[in-house]
Structures are given as C-alpha cells and as structure tokens.
C-alpha cells in the first residue's frame, strides 16, 4: 500500500484517530496529528497488532460466528451492541431507541465525530463534544427523558428535552448512572472538511496551478490603470457603461500560462477574509508611483501583506512622468523593511508605466517566476474546495456568488456547503460571461443555486449529496448562533493581565495612529520596550491620520489593540470596532498610553471613567458675534449635543481642541440640547478658530464601577 494518513488507517481499523495516535506513540512512532502520513512498514505493523487484538477479543468472548477477514466490521458493530442492547425491563422502549440510533447512523459522519457517540465496550466510556442535546444524552445512557430530567432537577437544573447542556453537566448526570464521559477535541469547520468530507491530497496527485494576485497601493498611484494595461482593456470605462461582466476576479494568459487577478480592494483580500481564516492571495503587487514615493496607504499595504505572509512584487509605476525618481522609492521602501533585489534584498521590483504600457510583460513574467519558486499546487482530480470572493442577491438569478476554486474541480450539479449555506450548482460563468460545465483550481466563477447569501471569505466544499450539504450547513448555522451568543474573546487592556496569567496572550499586537510621523515612531519605540518574559509587544502597523475602517479590520484579523494620539476614529471605524469588538484607545499624551499598557501588564489597570459619545455636529458656517466670539453654525449629524457636555473639535481626523460649550442656541433661544437633524449655533468656550467642515464631537465622562 502507498503512504496512508492516520485518520484513513483509523477508519480501516475501526478505531478513533486519537486511539491510533496513542498506539503510535507507544511504539515510538512520532506523528503530529490525524493528518500525518505513515509509511508502509508502520501501517502494516499497526494492522498486524490490531488484527491480533481483535482475535484475542473474539476468542475471549467465545463468539461462535466465524471471524471475518475484515476486522473493522466487528469493531464498528460492538459499540452498537452496547448502545442498543435491549433491556429486559422495557423491551419496547429499547426497540424505539434502536430505531433512532439506526436513523442517526444514516446522517453525516460529522455528528458522530463531534457531538454524539464513540464507545469503548470494555470500560463503558462515552465520548461527546463540548455540549450535547439532552435527548441525545438519554439515548446514549439508555434512559428515559423523564428519568434524566428528574436527575437534573435534583441537581438544581430546570431543562427541557431539546435543550443543550454543557460537558460538565452531562458528565455529572452520566456519573449518576455509573458511566464515564470523555470530552472529544472540538473541531472547527476546516477539521470537518479535512477529516470527514474530503481526504487530504497525496503529493503525487498535485499539479501546478495558476497564481492568484492582488494589486495594492496608495490611492491614485495607478492600481486600476495597471490592471487595465495588464488585461489590455479599459475596465473602468466599460464598467461605467455596464458592459463588462464584473465578478470580482479576472484571468489573463501569458506564455500559455494563466494568472488570476482579484478585483476586490487589496486590503479586503487581506483583512476581512483573513479574519475569517481564508487565504486567497498568493502574490501581492505593491504599486508605488515613482513621482510620489511611499505614502500612508503604501505602508498599510506592506503591513497587510507581511501579516498575511504573502510574497511581494513592487511595481514602480509612472516612470514616464517628470519628477519620477526610482531610487527615492527604493530608499523609502527599504525604510519600511522592503529591500529590493538590486539593493541586496529578495524583493523583485519592476519599473512600469501603465499609461505607456512599458514593462507590463516583464511584470507578468516576474509573477510567473515567483509562482514557480513558490510552487503553487493543487489536485484537479478531487472534489472542489473554494472560497467566496463576492456574493449578492440578484432579482433574476437569486443568490449569486463569485467563488475562487482553490483545489479540485467544481462541476455543474455538484452539492455544496458554503459556510452555513448550501445548495446545488445550477450554473457557472467565468469573468467574460461564458457558461462553464466545470471549473479547475485557480479559476474564478460566478455560481447560482445557493440557499442564502454567503459571506466573503466563506469556504465552499463539495459534498456527497444534498442531504449531507443541508445537514452540514444547519449544523454550522447552529454553531454560529451559539458562538454569537458568547462574547468574542478579543484582547483588550481591561483584561490583558488575566489573559496573560492564563497563558492566552503570548504576544500583544498594537496598531499606532498619530497626527504626525514623529509621534508614531516615538510611540512604537516606547511600547516595544515594555515587552517582558510573559508577553512581547509588537507594533504591526503605524500611520498618520484618523483611525480608519482598514485599521480596525487589520486589528480584527491580527487580534490587535489600536492606540491613537491626537486622532479620532471615523464613524465607520467606530461602528465596525463595536461589531468586531476591537479595543480602540485614544490619548492626548504619549506617556498616558505607555502607563496604561504598563499598568495593564502588571494587573493594576483600574480606569475610573469611561468616555460616552453623545453626538456629532458638522460646522456649516462660522460667524463672529460681538461679545460672544466665533459661533459655529452647525448641523447635528448623529445623536445630540448637550449644553453641559464636553466637546472636541476635529479637523481632517485630527483633534484641534478639547474643551466645553460656551453657548448653545436654536435661532435666538438658549437651549439645553439639540437633536439629530436640527441646526444650531455652538459657541466653544475660550476658542475661536472654528472653520467650515470641522466636526464637533460631544461626550461625557461616565464613572465605571468595578
């Protein structure tokens, strides 16, 4: 036999992967997990050992039936005999129980693996997941629901037959009946996919696949123009006219080889998708304008690519423009850890002109070169696995999703699971609108036939049939619902010490935003000096300007804290941070941040006040009023402005002033508050430098009881 995975051999022998791994360790055969491979000698040795064990068990139990050469059937049947053994007291009840267990075995193997049954006939040990439905527990224990519920009431718990109980409660109930429960390892969706639906590939089945490329860079540095030049089309112009089929990805051919370009914004390919565990990008093209150099979004793109551990190719664009200085770009890139090959580094740089079409072929050849070095491979002769790039609800087609096939081949008619949705592929079209019957690895296709709209980053998996697809999706939906009810465990300063003590935090990632570059560097250096033997502090991104949506998504993907100095988060960033539970801290003085983090690391953080946002007003005009100074004619865009509130004046994302309201008027009347959608005049106490377009934020400081 050829090399075999641990889980495959375990299935053949009729034992659990965990049991087989323990046996391997007893034999001094080192394996990492259930996906590890075994050579022929080790596999044959195990088969012999387990065959001998089976013969001993069979002779001890004096079974009259002839031993079948396929020992795994005996091993599978034995747990069922115990599980379904008829009780003399109530034979009818067990007949029903037997039927239910039979029905259960017809469902996907997933249920047995995660939540239900794995029995040891000798030791009476049952194995369950982190929780179990009470009805399933009664079947396992071979007891009536009334009997088990009565036991739980005696333990002070009121539960119903369909209620989920945790492992500790289930173990307590089982012990009342002399049965021991073991907790199985909790599997995530990827484990389910690898172990139960689709086996891992053999090295000999893998073939080269086209690379998937994302183009990133600062605004106006020529990302879209470069893609236009690469695809030899004016995509922007055509999309405006509604001609081009936009599915979020496109393909080009060069030297009879294919390259796939993702059209999604570069940062999204690295943040929102990476936060969901999906890696879609193989190579990142970093576009830098030769006349402009490295800019804030360029640095952001570098940090995203580094965090995702993706190879970078630099495209120095606009070399045809006056003032283009390639050496300056290379110098600035080296300052941010990107060392070009010509300067002794390992990052490829290609000078290009998207408008003139200069060196476009050279750039594509470099992509193919990196692809050859990285050896991107997939197995086209297996069930497909892919990832969702975009998804929407179309009035005519229903749910439409753009999927990048990462492994295997997807066919029209395949039953699929996509996150917590499912369906059968009704139709597939490529980036030019052609209908396809099948899609191979690194092909982007638009599919229809899903039950609901999936999220970008969800994994698509082909399964055996519609029933398995539906059951798997429903199970994932239930799991997601349970997870939603729990508070997402993000790192925050308030509980940093506790997480350090429990060993949950080994590295604290920090994103620093400030009003000037000097502050960013000073803060990064000061914070990184705070590292100790329990936790190391690492600044994964630093930039100038307001805290943006992109910063929050990077923090969510990297489990980081955001610290801001003299800057504020945008409205969108604030909303997303609440949803993703990302901790944002803003300061006026650098040392306050250092003291806070230092105090949190030694368990001394005890904040007395919390800032509560009340509302925002946009300054539409500024008037000089005799005796009152400058009054800001404002429109309330969010919440409300209170006369007694503290305020800060924000200009272009930078905090210009913090203070109190001197006057608040509607027409000629003094008022205590003004709500959303109304205009008013706001006088800021002892401050007159108000300009049109400024944002006035009102807030109060609320005491926190700990």
UniProtKB/Swiss-Prot annotation:
It is found in: Cytoplasm. Residues 67-81 have a biased composition (Basic and acidic residues). Residues 55-117 are annotated as: Disordered. InterPro entries: EF-G-like_DII, IF2_II, IF2_N, P-loop_NTPase, Small_GTP-bd, T_Tr_GTP-bd_dom, TF_IF2_bacterial-like, TIF_IF2. GO terms for cellular component: cytosol. It comes from the Bacteria. Keywords: Cytoplasm, GTP-binding, Initiation factor, Nucleotide-binding, Protein biosynthesis. CDD domains: IF2_eIF5B, IF2_mtIF2_II, mtIF2_IVc. Residues 317-320 are annotated as: G4. GO terms for molecular function: GTP binding; GTPase activity; translation initiation factor activity. Residues 242-246 are annotated as: G2. GTP binds at residues 217-224, 263-267, 317-320. Signal peptide: none annotated. Disulfide bonds: none annotated. Residues 263-266 are annotated as: G3. Residues 93-108 have a biased composition (Basic residues). Residues 353-355 are annotated as: G5. Its main location: cytoplasm. Residues 208-375 form the tr-type G domain. HAMAP family: IF_2_B. This is Translation initiation factor IF-2. It comes from Alkaliphilus metalliredigens (strain QYMF). The lineage of its organism: Bacteria, Bacillati, Bacillota, Clostridia, Peptostreptococcales.
């Amino acid at each position: 036999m050829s090399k075999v995975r641990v889980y495959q051999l375990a299935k053949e022998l009729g034992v659990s992967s965990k049991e087989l791994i323990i046996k391997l360790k007893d034999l001094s055969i080192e394996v990492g997990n259930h996906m590890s491979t075994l050579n022929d000698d080790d596999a044959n040795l195990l088969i012999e050992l387990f065959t001998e064990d089976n013969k001993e068990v069979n002779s001890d139990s004096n079974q009259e039936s002839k031993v079948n050469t396929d020992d795994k059937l005996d091993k599978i049947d034995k747990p069922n005999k115990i599980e379904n053994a008829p009780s003399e007291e109530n034979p009818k009840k067990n007949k029903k129980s037997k039927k239910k267990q039979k029905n259960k075995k017809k469902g996907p193997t997933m249920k047995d693996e995660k939540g239900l049954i794995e029995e040891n006939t000798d030791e009476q040990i049952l194995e369950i997941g982190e929780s179990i439905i009470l009805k399933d527990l009664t079947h396992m224990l071979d007891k009536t629901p009334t009997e088990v519920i009565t036991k739980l009431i005696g333990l002070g718990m009121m539960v119903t037959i369909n209620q989920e109980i945790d492992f500790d409660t289930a173990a307590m109930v089982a012990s009342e009946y002399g049965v021991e429960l073991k907790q199985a390892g909790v599997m995530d969706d990827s484990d389910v996919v690898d172990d139960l639906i689709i086996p891992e590939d053999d090295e000999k089945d893998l073939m080269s696949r086209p690379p998937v490329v994302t183009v990133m860079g600062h605004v106006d540095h020529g990302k879209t123009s470069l893609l236009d030049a690469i695809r030899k089309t004016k995509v922007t112009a055509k999309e405006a006219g509604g001609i081009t089929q936009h599915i979020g990805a496109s393909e080009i051919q060069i030297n009879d080889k294919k390259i796939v370009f993702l059209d999604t914004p570069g940062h999204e390919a690295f943040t929102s998708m990476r936060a969901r565990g999906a890696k879609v990008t193989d190579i990142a093209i970093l576009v830098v304008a030769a006349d402009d150099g490295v800019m804030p979004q360029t640095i952001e793109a570098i940090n995203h690519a580094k965090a995702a551990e993706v190879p970078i190719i630099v495209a120095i664009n606009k070399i045809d423009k006056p003032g283009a200085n390639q050496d300056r770009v290379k110098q600035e890139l080296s300052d941010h850890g990107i060392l070009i090959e010509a300067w002794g580094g390992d990052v490829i740089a290609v000078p290009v002109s998207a408008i003139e079409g200069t060196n476009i072929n050279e750039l594509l050849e470099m992509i193919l070169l990196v692809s050859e070095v990285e050896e991107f491979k997939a197995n086209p002769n297996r069930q497909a696995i892919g990832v969702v790039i975009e998804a929407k609800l179309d009035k005519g087609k229903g749910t439409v999703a753009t999927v990048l096939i990462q492994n295997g081949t997807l066919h029209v008619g395949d039953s699929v699971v996509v996150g917590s949705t499912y369906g059968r592929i009704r139709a597939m079209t490529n980036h030019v609108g052609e209908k396809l019957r099948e899609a191979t690895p690194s092909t982007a296709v638009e599919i229809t036939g899903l039950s609901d709209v999936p999220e970008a980053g969800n994994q698509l998996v082909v399964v055996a049939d519609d029933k398995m697809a539906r059951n798997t999706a429903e199970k994932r939906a239930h799991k997601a619902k349970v997870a939603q009810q729990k508070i997402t465990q993000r790192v925050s300063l308030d509980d940093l010490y506790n997480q350090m003590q429990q060993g949950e935090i080994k590295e604290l990632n920090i994103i620093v935003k400030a009003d000037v570059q000097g502050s960013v560097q000073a803060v990064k250096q000061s914070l990184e000096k705070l590292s100790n033997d329990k936790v190391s502090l690492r600044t994964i991104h630093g930039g100038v300007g307001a805290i943006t949506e992109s910063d929050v998504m990077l923090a969510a993907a990297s489990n980081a804290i955001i610290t801001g100095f003299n800057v504020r988060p945008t409205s969108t960033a604030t909303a997303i941070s609440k949803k993703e539970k990302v901790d944002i801290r803003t300061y006026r003085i650098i040392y306050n941040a250092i003291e806070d983090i230092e105090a949190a690391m030694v368990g001394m953080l005890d904040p007395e006040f919390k800032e509560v946002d009340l509302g925002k007003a946009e300054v539409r005009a500024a008037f000089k009023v005799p005796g009152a100074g400058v009054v800001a004619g404002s429109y309330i865009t969010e919440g409300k402005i209170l006369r007694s509130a503290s305020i800060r004046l924000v200009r272009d994302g930078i905090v210009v002033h913090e203070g109190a309201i001197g006057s608040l008027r509607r027409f000629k009347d003094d008022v205590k508050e003004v709500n959303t959608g109304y205009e008013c005049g706001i006088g800021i106490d002892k401050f007159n430098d108000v300009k049109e377009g400024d944002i006035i934020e009102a807030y109060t400081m609320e005491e926190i009881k700990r």
